[in-house]
C-alpha cells in the first residue's frame, strides 16, 4: 500500500510516527508555547529528533513544553527554545541571524505559529496583524535561513481550509481601503502561506529542498480565543457545504494530536516528491488551487512589502 494511503483524518502524531527513528534530525518548529506547536514538538522529540522550538514568550514556552522535554529525554531527543516574535521584523532578523551564526543545518522547518480572526491591529512594523504574523513573519524568517536547509530538507507551512475565505490582496494588505473583516484577513494570510510553500518549492527543489502547505483540521486550541464559538460553527458549516458540493467529506472536530498529525506526516513520513509544492490535509495530498502567475505574483509582492518595510 502506498504510504499516502495509510493514514487519514483520525490519525494521531504518534500513530503517524510509529516506528520512526528521528535521531540525528534537527527540526525547527515555530509557536511551541501552545496547542499544535507543543504537540508537534513533543511527537518529534519523542521519536528522537532535536527540536528547536521558537516562541515569543519564552517563559510561557518553558512551562508549556515540560512534557516535551520529558518525552524527549526518554527517546534520545532534545528541545531547545529560541526567542521569536513573528510580528516584529527586528526580532525575526535577530533570531535568523543567531541561527545562521550557529551554522547548524535543519532537516525540517515547520512554520506552525499563527493567530486567527484577531481584532484589527498592526504588527510592530505596521502590517495588518494576521497577514504580518501568519505569513510575512515566516516569509522573512524562512528566506533568511534558507541556506540552513540542505539537500533532503523540507519546509512545512501551516495553512488552513480558511484559505477559502479570501485570495491575497497585496494592493490593500493593511485594509486601508477595505472594511476589516477578521476571517477575510485570516483567509488572506492562509492563502499566502500556501502560495509561499509552492513558490519556495519551485525555487529550491533543484537543490533537493521541498516545501508543502498543510491544513491541520478544525481543532479547539488557543488559536480561536478571539472568536465566538457560534461564529466558528457557521464558518465550518459553510466550508462543509462547499466540500459536500465537491463530493468531499465534511469537517469533523479533531483532537490536538490528530490536528498535528498532518504536519509530522509531511515533515518525515510522506515521500518528498509526493508532497513537494502541494497542499495537504488529513495526511493526504490535496488539490492544486493556484496557477503559476498567482504564485509568482504573490511571492514577488511580499518581497516588495519587506523591502518597503526596511526603508521606513
PLM feature spans:
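Generic hydrophobic secondary-structure packing signal
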Residues: 37, 57-60, 189, 255-262, ...
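SDR active-site lid
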Residues: 202-292
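Conserved C-terminal active-site "lid" loop/helix of NAD(P)H-dependent oxidoreductases
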Residues: 278-312
Amino acid at each position: 500500500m502506498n504510504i499516502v494511503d495509510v493514514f487519514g483524518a483520525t490519525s494521531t502524531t504518534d500513530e503517524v510516527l510509529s516506528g520512526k527513528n528521528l535521531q540525528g534530525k534537527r527540526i525547527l518548529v515555530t509557536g511551541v508555547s501552545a496547542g499544535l506547536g507543543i504537540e508537534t514538538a513533543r511527537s518529534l522529540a519523542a521519536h528522537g529528533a532535536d527540536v528547536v522550538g521558537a516562541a515569543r514568550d519564552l517563559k510561557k514556552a518553558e512551562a508549556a513544553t515540560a512534557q516535551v522535554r520529558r518525552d524527549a529525554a526518554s527517546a534520545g531527543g532534545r528541545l531547545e527554545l529560541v526567542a521569536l516574535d513573528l510580528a516584529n521584523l527586528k526580532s525575526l532578523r535577530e533570531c535568523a541571524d543567531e541561527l545562521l551564526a550557529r551554522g547548524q543545518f535543519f532537516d525540517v522547518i515547520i512554520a506552525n505559529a499563527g493567530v486567527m480572526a484577531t481584532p484589527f491591529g498592526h504588527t510592530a512594523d505596521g502590517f495588518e496583524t494576521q497577514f504580518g504574523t501568519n505569513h510575512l513573519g515566516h516569509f522573512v524568517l524562512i528566506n533568511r535561513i534558507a541556506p540552513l536547509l540542505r539537500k533532503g530538507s523540507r519546509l512545512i507551512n501551516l495553512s488552513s481550509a480558511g484559505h477559502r475565505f479570501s485570495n491575497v490582496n497585496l494592493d490593500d494588505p493593511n485594509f486601508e481601503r477595505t472594511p476589516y473583516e477578521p476571517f477575510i484577513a485570516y483567509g488572506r494570510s492562509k492563502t499566502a502561506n500556501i502560495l509561499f510553500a509552492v513558490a519556495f518549492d519551485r525555487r529550491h527543489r533543484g537543490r533537493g529542498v521541498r516545501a508543502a502547505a498543510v491544513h491541520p483540521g478544525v481543532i479547539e486550541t488557543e488559536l480561536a480565543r478571539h472568536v465566538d464559538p457560534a461564529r466558528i460553527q457557521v464558518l465550518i458549516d459553510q466550508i462543509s457545504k462547499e466540500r459536500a458540493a465537491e463530493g468531499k467529506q465534511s469537517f469533523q472536530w479533531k483532537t490536538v494530536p490528530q490536528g498535528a498529525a498532518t504536519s509530522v506526516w509531511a515533515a518525515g513520513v510522506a515521500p518528498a516528491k509526493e508532497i513537494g509544492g502541494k497542499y495537504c490535509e488529513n495526511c493526504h495530498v490535496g488539490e492544486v488551487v493556484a496557477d503559476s502567475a498567482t504564485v509568482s505574483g504573490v511571492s514577488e509582492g511580499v518581497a516588495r512589502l519587506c523591502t518597503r518595510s526596511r526603508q521606513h
